[in-house]
Amino acid sequence: MSRTFGMASFTKFEEIEAWKTAELIVVQAYGLLKAGPGARDWALKDQIQRASVSVMCNISEGFESRSDRTFYDMLRRAKGSCGEVRTLTYVAAKIGHIPLEKYELLRPLCIKCSSQIQALMTHLETTRPDVPSRKRW
């Protein structure tokens, strides 16, 4: 199945820029708490890792659903998970579990991914009749 977004057309979710950015987030998120003060905070470490993987999974699951409405809903979840990663890594930096510099490397990736996801959502809102427009909420 091919999905067209403006001038871009995707046949696989791996071609979506937001998914590629999310992959970079996962790699960084897993490396954040390998060592150092936060390595033993299993709950925070697990939540950061699960939220980062959730971004990738929601994008791919939505794409593979073959429904524009489901894709939109999964993109919304992915965007939320992206914000969760950003918040959790901010907390980890504030409580001294990771150096602030590591958070500052991950933060722009989260913002970029969130913007990429929003662009896909906006396109769906404006071009697909079965996707709710924010104007109708």
Question: Which residues make up each language-model segment?
Answer:
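Short, C-terminally biased terminal segments at protein or domain edges
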Residues: 1-137
